Amino acid sequence: MAGTTSTNQYLVIFTLCIACLLGSLHFYEVFPLTLGFQGRWVGVILEGQLGNQLWGMASSHGIARARDANWCWVDTTGRWATYQHYIQWLTSAPRQCENDGWANVILWVFSPYHFISDNGNFAKYQDIFVSSSKPRILMKGMLQSYKFFNPDLPIPFKLRAASMARRWVGVRNITVAIHIRRGDKLWDIGNVAPPLSYYNLAISMLTQLFPQDPQTFVIVTDDPGWVQAQSEFSGMHTLMSEDPSFDMAVIAACKHKIISIGTFGWWGAFLGDTGDNRTSAVIYPTLQMQWPKASGFDNSDYFPQHWTGIDYALEN
């Protein structure tokens, strides 16, 4: 009986080893991190919705480029279906680093990884992501700083809706996009949704900066009801389509951008940024976060220097 028990135990162990080996063989084809395989890699765990996903892609790609490393996305939580939902809007995106299942066991137990988290500093540049001496690093966090990548170099994706959005903007002769984000930002503690006074100030500033430019506006928003209730926005186009990537591409297609809080507006502005504030403007609210989120946010790491910030008073 004892011999049979021992044999069964060995059989279970042998079966587990074979399963691990089979998983690692497929895993090696797409992400050679396990069991000491050679190569420099940067893997990123993407989080959030479209804007946050773009931050993770751009920043991790920039870090991989700085480290002369390969780059991919790691599925450690089985969110592949969610990720596919977002990449359908992009012309290209990082490949999946690994298969789930036994490959995950191999990854976490045997791989000589340097796991780095932003530790709540979601919008602050941290050199540790770039300077790690390990050949393979796995990053987790929002990575919301343009300093992680070179804004002057091409980012590794484009919005599929970009051409359609340019046509949409051109037919209507729109020159200014206003992004108004409210929704969850009204109740999520630490976020500061800009009041109406901010948008009035931004429009006035834009007129002062470019007095000769005709101003035809489109408002891209998640709260069209609130927009329609404001007389200041009367006569402006309002857009909230079923395709967030199209809405983002419309912001990018406009010459000037007035953005709100959140990563969605940031990427809409950045993807259409000329880099020259003498010919076009990106205007943003300087007050983005309050306690408890303010400690993880740095305006100078988040907003490019040539963008224009506006200070405003919060309305009661």
Predicted regions and their residues:
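N-terminal signal-anchor transmembrane helix specifying type II single-pass membrane topology
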Residues: 2-33
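Leloir-type glycosyltransferase catalytic cores
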Residues: 14-24, 288-316
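Nucleotide-activated donor-dependent transferases that construct or modify glycoconjugates
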Residues: 33-48
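Secretory-pathway luminal glycosyltransferase catalytic domains
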Residues: 40, 76-214, 303, 310-316
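A short, glycine/small-residue-rich beta-strand->loop->alpha-helix junction that serves as a flexible
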Residues: 46-55, 187, 193
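Short, solvent-exposed loop/turn segments at secondary-structure junctions
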Residues: 49-50, 77-81, 143-145, 181-185, ...
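Histidine-anchored nucleotide/phosphate-binding helix
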Residues: 53-65, 199-207
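Donor-binding and catalytic core of enzymes assembling or modifying cell-surface/extracellular glycoconjugates
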Residues: 209-292
